Each structure stands twice: as C-alpha cells, then as structure tokens.
Amino acid sequence: MNVVNTLQIIVANMLIYSTPLIFTSIGGVFSERGGIVNVGLEGIMTIGAFSSVVFNLTTAGMFGSMTPWLSILFGALIGALFSSLHAVATVNLRADHIVSGTVLNLMAPALGVFLLQVFYQQGQININEQIGYWNVPLLSNIPVIGKIFFTQTSLPGFLAIVVAILAWYVLFKTRFGLRLRSVGENPQAADTLGINVYAYRWAGVLLSGVLGGVGGAIYAQAISGNFSVSTIAGQGFISLAAMIFGKWNPIGAMLSSLLFGLFTSLAVVGGQIPGIKEIPSSFLQMAPYVFTIIVLALFLGKAIAPKADGVNYIKSK
C-alpha cells in the first residue's frame, strides 16, 4: 500500500467517524454558552440514533435512497423533544444540571431497548438504506489531493464542517449569538437589558438537542447501520470532551472532533495501515477513550467555561 492510499484511508475514515462528534459537540457549545451544562449529550445521541433507525425501517420502501437523510431530520426532531426534558428541569425547575443530564443518559438507552422489544421483539435492529461513501465531483480528480481528501469520503462530514463555520458565525457575529453568550456569562445583566434569559437558555438547549440528535442519527445511518443498547457507546462523552478541548468554540469543537475521529478511525482501519497493524487491536480500540481521559485531565481545569455555566437563574422581582 502506497502513501497516498494510506492517507486516503485515514482521512476518509477520520471524516466519517468525526462527523457525529462535530455535530454533537457544537450542540454542547450552544447549550453551555447559554449557561446550561449538558452532560446528557450521550443520551440525546442515543435517542437520535434510535428514532432515526425506526424511521428508516418504517419508510425505506416509500423514500428509497432519500430515507437515511430524512431519518437524520427525524432524529434531529426527536433529539430536540428529548432535550426539552433537560430544559424544563434546568431552566424552569432549576434542577442540578449534572443530575438532569445524567437522567437523560440513563433514560435513553433503556427507553430505546424497551421500545425495540415492544415494536420488533428483539434487542437490535439493522437498516437496509445507509449513507454510503461519496466522491466529490471535480475535486476528486485533482492529483494526489483529490485522492486523499475527496475520494470515497463522507458527504455528512463536509456538511458538518460547514455547520461548524455557520455556528461560529451565529454565535459570534449575530444578535442571537451575542444574547445567548450574555445569558451564559452574566444573566442578571442580560435580564436588566431586557433579554429573556429563560427563552435564550431554552434555545441553547434545544439547539443542542437538534445537533445531538443529528449526530446520533448520522452515527446510526452512516457508521453502525443498526441500533442497540451499545450503538453510541460513549460517543456523547467524547463529544463533551471535544467541546471542552475546543474551549466552547464551534471551530475549536470541530477541530477537536476531527482529532478524536482520527483516533477512532485508527482503531477501525489500523489493521490495514503499515506500522499500525502490528499494534494489538485491543490497544487501538481503547485509544479514543484513553485520549478522552487524557484531554479531560489536562484541560478541564485550564479551560475557562462561561461564567454562569451551570448556574441556575432566578429572576429578581
């Protein structure tokens, strides 16, 4: 295997495995920039994956090759609805953010497996219509670069990069983003200026639900091709680490997700790559999770979160 083919395998798989992380970590950015800690990203991804797979199986005969894409939209919708539980608990009822997010993480896989038994009488379901690999028109014909970056790659991956750029623009260059960040930094001052703190915090959590649902749906539609209790398997927690490593910035979260995606891709395709295939597969499979622990240990104390992140707001009378 030559260098170009090796790089093509690594880059293509890195983009595929980082895509769910990019969407979900950006969702976490919106939630926490608004002041709501969302450790429930794992649960949101799980419910997004479950709902997208059910939609895929139900409508595949109707929509054909468009089914996976519509399934992603359905996963986004269900992710938003599921995240509203977190919004009610933290924004309206002023519950502890960590406890509320943990409830989502515990509820989602249990609910998914229960409904699988109810609907299909089994603990795992597979889909027939998946998102396949894609050659970028024109760009894939560029010598060397086209082979590495634009051949047999992931269309959702490129969409995720576009979403990251748009999210950065919304967060830092629009009135909505300025107000969302203000309620995450100093909600009292924002309220004094007439900004509805509760509404913007709700918006941040719902955006995290939409993007987390998309992340889970893409994982099911493009990577696993199924849903079971172990489908997501820590991807939400890795997304949370990517958000922290990226310093609550959409671009930083995207770059961090690409790095985590690289480690995950090496765990999957390492057996095909000279110099890596000699490493025991068990070490490669644990690498993404070990790297997550290292990142959190090194950067959690140093990364500066929004000042009011995790602080419940009580409107003054």
UniProtKB/Swiss-Prot annotation:
InterPro entries: ABC_transp_permease. Its main location: membrane. The chain crosses the membrane at residues 9-29, 35-55, 62-82, 98-118, 132-151, 155-172, 203-223, 225-245, 251-271, 286-306. One of its GO terms (molecular function) is transmembrane transporter activity. It holds the Pfam family BPD_transp_2. Signal peptide: none annotated. Keywords: Cell membrane, Membrane, Transmembrane, Transmembrane helix, Transport. It is found in: Cell membrane. One of its GO terms (cellular component) is plasma membrane. It is a multi-pass membrane protein. The keyword Transmembrane helix applies. Induction: Constitutively expressed. Belongs to the binding-protein-dependent transport system permease family. The complex is composed of two ATP-binding proteins (NupA), two transmembrane proteins (NupB and NupC) and a solute-binding protein (BmpA). Part of an ABC transporter complex involved in the uptake of all common nucleosides. Responsible for the translocation of the substrate across the membrane. PANTHER family: GUANOSINE ABC TRANSPORTER PERMEASE PROTEIN NUPQ, SUGAR ABC TRANSPORTER INTEGRAL MEMBRANE PROTEIN-RELATED. This is Nucleoside ABC transporter permease protein NupC. It comes from Lactococcus lactis subsp. cremoris (strain MG1363).
